[in-house]
UniProtKB/Swiss-Prot annotation:
NCBIfam families: PRK05416.1
Binding site residues for GTP: D77, V78, R79, S80
GO molecular function: ATP binding; GTP binding
Keyword Nucleotide-binding attributed: yes
Protein family: Belongs to the RapZ-like family.
Function comment: Displays ATPase and GTPase activities.
Amino-acid positions noted as binding ATP in the UniProt annotation, renumbered to this chain: G26, V27, S28, G29, G30, G31, R32, S33
Native species: Salinispora tropica (strain ATCC BAA-916 / DSM 44818 / JCM 13857 / NBRC 105044 / CNB-440)
Keywords from the UniProt entry: ATP-binding, GTP-binding, Nucleotide-binding
Transmembrane spans: none
Protein name: Nucleotide-binding protein Strop_3101
Disulfide bonds: none
Length: 302
C-alpha cells in the first residue's frame, strides 16, 4: 500500500457535513483512538468502545436528540469471535433503516503494529499466551467481514498521529470546524496573568487613560478611549507586530492539531489599554481570515 493510503469507494463522499453517522473500527494499534479524537475536533459526538449490540439504539437516540448528536461516531473494537458477524449484521441493519452509516476501517502492516505495541510495552488484546503476531492474526480474521463493509479504508502504516488526524479532518470536517480559533484576552496584571495564555504582551508602556479625567470612568471599548490608546506613539507598531506574530504561527499550530490559541494583552487593571488593544488586534486578525474574538477578563473588577 502507498503511504497514508485512503480508499473511499462509491458515493456519496463522506467529507463535509452530509455524513451524520460514522462507524469506526479496525485493527488494534491501527489508530482508532486518533480517529475518534479527530472526529471530536470537527464536531462529532463520539461514543468509544460501544458494544455492537447497541449500535442501532445509539443511532436512533442520536437522530431523536438532534443538535450536535446528529453527527455521531461510534468506535468499536474486537473482543470476541461473535464480533465480526454481529458488526456486519448491525451495519447492514443501520443501512436498511436508512441511517446511511459511513464505515471507517483503520489498518496498518503487521510489522508496524508490532513496533507500535512494543514501543508502549503492551500486549495485543487477543494474543493470550501467544506472540504479538498471533494476536494480530486472530484479529485480522475476526475483522475480515467488517473490513469488507468499509466505505473509508485508511492505511496508517506510514502516518504519524498528526497526519492521521489531518486526514480524518479533511474527510469529515466542515471547513469552520477545522479552523484555528484565536481568542484575544485583555487582563490586568494586578489580577494575574491568564494561566491558559499561549502568548502574553504588555501594553503598560502606553500612557494610561486613567489619568485623563474625561476617560477614567470609561473602558477601552468606548471609542474615545480606544482612539486615545491607539493614537499613542508605538501603539500601531505594537498591534501590527503582535498580529504578524500570530499570523506567522497559526499555520504551524494547525499542522500540529491545535484548535484554540489564547493571545493575552495586559495593562495595569485590564480596563483601558489592554481592552482597546485586544479589540483592535482581534479585528485585524479577522481581516486576515482568522477566526478571532476578543474577551475582557477583568472588566468590572475595579
Amino acid at each position: 500500500m502507498i503511504e497514508g493510503q485512503t480508499s473511499v469507494p462509491g458515493e456519496p463522499d463522506p467529507s463535509g457535513t452530509d455524513t451524520t453517522l460514522v462507524v469506526v473500527t479496525g485493527v488494534s494499534g491501527g489508530g482508532r483512538s486518533t480517529v475518534a479524537r479527530a472526529l471530536e475536533n470537527v464536531g462529532y459526538y463520539v461514543v468509544d468502545n460501544l458494544p455492537q449490540a447497541l449500535m442501532l439504539d445509539m443511532a436512533e437516540l442520536a437522530m431523536k436528540a438532534g443538535g450536535a448528536a446528529r453527527r455521531t461516531a461510534m468506535v468499536l473494537d474486537v473482543r470476541s469471535r461473535a464480533f465480526s458477524t454481529d458488526l456486519v449484521g448491525a451495519i447492514r441493519e443501520l443501512k436498511e433503516r436508512g441511517f446511511g452509516p459511513r464505515v471507517v476501517f483503520v489498518d496498518a502492516d503487521d510489522e508496524v503494529l508490532i513496533r507500535r505495541f512494543e514501543s508502549v510495552r503492551r500486549s495485543h488484546p487477543l494474543q493470550g499466551e501467544g506472540r504479538l503476531a498471533d494476536g494480530i492474526a486472530v484479529e485480522r480474521g475476526l475483522l475480515e467481514g467488517a473490513r469488507d463493509q468499509a466505505d473509508v479504508f485508511v492505511d496508517t502504516s506510514h502516518l504519524n498521529v498528526n497526519q492521521l488526524r489531518r486526514r480524518i479532518e479533511e474527510l469529515f470536517g466542515a471547513e469552520d470546524a477545522r479552523r484555528l480559533r484565536v481568542t484575544v484576552v485583555s487582563f490586568g496584571f494586578k489580577y494575574g496573568v491568564p494561566p491558559d495564555a499561549d502568548f502574553v504582551c504588555d501594553a503598560r508602556f502606553l500612557p494610561n487613560p486613567y489619568w485623563v479625567p474625561e476617560l477614567r470612568e470609561h473602558t477601552g471599548q468606548v471609542e474615545a478611549v480606544s482612539s486615545y490608546v491607539l493614537g499613542q506613539a508605538g501603539a500601531e507598531d505594537f498591534v501590527a507586530t503582535y498580529a504578524d506574530l500570530l499570523n506567522a504561527t497559526t499555520a504551524g499550530f494547525e499542522r500540529e492539531g491545535k484548535r484554540y490559541v489564547t493571545a493575552a494583552v495586559g495593562c495595569t487593571g485590564g480596563k483601558h489599554r489592554s481592552v482597546a488593544i485586544a479589540e483592535e488586534l482581534a479585528a485585524r486578525l479577522r481581516q486576515t481570515g482568522l477566526a478571532a474574538t476578543a474577551q475582557h477578563r477583568d472588566l468590572g473588577r475595579e
